[in-house]
Regions:
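N-terminal Rossmann-like NAD(P)+-binding subdomain of aldehyde/semialdehyde dehydrogenases
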Residues: 1-138
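Conserved C-terminal structural/oligomerization subdomain of aldehyde/semialdehyde dehydrogenase
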Residues: 33-37, 201, 260, 314
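A general structural signal for well-ordered alpha-helical segments in protein cores
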Residues: 50, 72, 108-109, 115, ...
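Generic non-transmembrane alpha-helical segments
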Residues: 74-78, 82-85, 191, 195-201, ...
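Rossmann-like NAD(P) dinucleotide-binding subdomain of oxidoreductase/dehydrogenase enzymes
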Residues: 124, 128-269
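Glycine-rich phosphate/pyrophosphate-binding beta-alpha loops
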Residues: 43, 158, 280
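ALDH superfamily catalytic-core signature
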Residues: 235-316
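Residue-level signal for inorganic ion chemistry
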Residues: 32, 68, 90, 112, ...
Length: 316
């Protein structure tokens, strides 16, 4: 793989790249060295992004479903073309093995492909209302409509996958958005922004803003946002929900996943699976194994093998 990072990366404000500074340093997670720089948004830039998203909403509503689908399919094609660049950037900024990075890029492509397919299948329903003589001949209709400008805050552990889970459905539904990617791993979302900027999305449809705490409260409290989607720790997520006002809030927080091991389980196989589930990516996954419930008849045998194999893990 012959790839390298650029010297600097912009943020994206109302569909356009902007390089006001190079304040955010991105580290190679393996060496700990700064390898590139990213533009950092301040409160004024965040405000401009929200204004643009709010102004753009009517234009997003008026996009035909096939037009939104074309945007998403363009992204699918471009992600495939730039597959190695995405994988390399993820490998460096997140410290993932290149095999896992490639897997996450594939998941990015799949997510946008599914969103493209669903963008033309946003249905409504007709239902009878003739429950009495007075209502004879009456029917009711409902349809799904875009909720409005969305605020997205994505985490560091799956910079592409978890950004895609927010961005692609928003485009499919016709919702403008402003995203704050994790400061530790901003490159994935910025690369997505670069490809979105090639499309005919109306100005203001998206902004991708790495940001410090200066002004970041706007992602949570600003009433022009009609939905906040946050992926991260329970402590932060519940605090954001408490301060978010009347907007809808979607929280994807840390889990408490359990494994149940019965007495007739293949212990060698189970031990390998539990170790992988618990220690993959240093346990930095919302579905990492955090509880192991073992039948008492095999507890000692499982514990012995589990400890032996865990001691052989190599960090770094």
């Amino acid at each position: 793989m012959k790839n390298k990072l650029r010297d600097k990366y912009p943020l994206y404000l109302a569909n356009e790249p902007l390089q006001p500074n190079v304040s955010l340093k991105v580290e190679d997670k393996y060496t700990g060295e700064a390898v590139t720089s990213v533009a950092l948004a301040d409160a004024e830039i965040i405000e401009r992004a929200i204004v643009a998203a709010d102004d753009c909403f009517e234009k997003m509503i008026n996009m035909a479903s096939y037009e939104r689908q074309e945007v998403l399919l363009h992204c699918v094609q471009r992600f495939r073309e730039d597959f190695d660049e995405f994988a390399y950037a993820l490998c460096v900024e997140a410290g993932k093995p290149i095999r896992d990075s490639r897997g996450e890029v594939s998941r990015l492509i799949d997510t946008f492909k599914i969103a493209a397919e669903e963008s033309t299948r946003i249905y409504g329903e007709i239902q009878p209302l003739d429950i009495s003589e007075r209502a004879k001949g009456y029917r009711g209709m409902w349809k799904r409509v875009p909720i409005g400008p969305c605020s997205f805050i994505s985490p560091f552990n799956f910079p592409l996958n978890l950004a895609a889970h927010k961005i692609a459905p928003a485009i499919a539904a016709g919702c403008p958005f402003v995203m704050k990617p994790a400061s530790k791993t901003p490159l994935g979302a910025i690369l997505i922004g670069g490809i979105l900027a090639e499309t005919n999305l109306p100005k203001g449809a998206f902004s991708i803003l790495p940001a410090s705490r200066d002004g970041s409260d706007l992602f949570t409290i600003d009433e022009r946002f009609k939905l906040l989607s946050f992926t991260g720790s329970p402590e932060v997520g519940w605090d954001l929900k408490a301060r978010s006002g009347k907007k809808k809030v979607v929280l994807e927080l840390g889990g408490n996943a359990a494994v149940i091991i019965d007495k007739d389980s293949d212990i060698d196989s189970v031990v390998d699976r539990v170790i992988f589930g618990a220690f993959y990516q240093s346990g930095q996954s919302c579905i990492s194994v955090q509880r192991v419930i073992v039948h008492e008849k095999i507890y000692d045998k499982f514990k012995k093998k589990f400890v032996e194999k865990t001691k052989k893990l190599i960090s770094g």
